[in-house]
Amino acid sequence: MQSILNLGYGITMDAPVFSGSSAGSSPIGTTANTQDFITSEASHLGLFDLHYYGGNACNGNTEAADFLMTEAAINKSTMISRPNNIGTLLSTLHTAGRNNARIGEMNSIACLGQAGVSDTFQSALWFLDEAMSYAQAGVSGINLFSVATTSYYSPFTFGHSGTTPSFTYSLGKINPIYYGMLAESMMLQSNAALLPVTLSTSKNIKAYATKDSANNVRLLLINKEETASGDGSVTLTMSGGGNASLWKLLVTGNNYAASDYTALTTGGDTITLGGQTFKGSTDGSIQGTQSLPTVVPSGSNYTIPLPHTSAVIVKIPLS
């Protein structure tokens, strides 16, 4: 690396930029080898960047229809960059005196995503869980990867007409993952910091919490149960809070395979966040009237309805 620094030409940078595999099957993509790289080259590291994909659609591979509802999509065992492993690398990085680590490229399924999976409601739930898992692990940030060509995992697609340089662009689709991105931004707004959460359940439910600079607590509940047997409610115990407002992330029929563009039910399917939707939008603006149900606590307990295949952000102002 020092020999590269000594060349002295090209774009001036604080340190050389390298991109290495995050897959455990690669000779350089093992946890031990990556730790050795960090330790050996710490003085040259400006940013430690890894990639993550939950699944694989490359070379004809396919994932199960409900893949993004599974824990395997959150923590892919062959990716050293997975949330439940990256803490080991971050510890080595911090010991070496470096703190800037990022998931510089990630999405649901590698090689443009998978039709019927990456472009359905389950991708919104996956993104929320994945992003909050990385926040808990301590990474500085994440970059959701997208491409200009047609793909299934891109938040948006666009159409264009005309010729260079006078193209006219139009909105093609807003995919379900974008709802997850918006919900994630709500959780992290206003300099929010993570709070510890203790969850007791046998269901496929995840919980994350933050508190922002205005003293608002937000609890994210994600129910990845796939059938009505997973319907129910969550009792949240927290003292010192006011009435809670609910931002519900819902889809028609609680169907993980639905989107704003499917017709799995009569009249078509719709995703809503806080009662609003992008379905029918021609310019990217959200449609409909916002609806935020209120939950009044009983003592220190809040009862939050949580149907299967859904998520909700519970906002509670602290007194």
Region locations from a protein language model:
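Aromatic/acidic polysaccharide-binding cleft in carbohydrate-active enzymes
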Residues: I103, N107-A207, S213-A214
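Extended hydrophobic packing segments that form well-structured cores
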Residues: S300-L318
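Residue-level detector of short, conserved catalytic/binding motifs and their immediate flanks
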Residues: G46, M132, S140, V217, ...
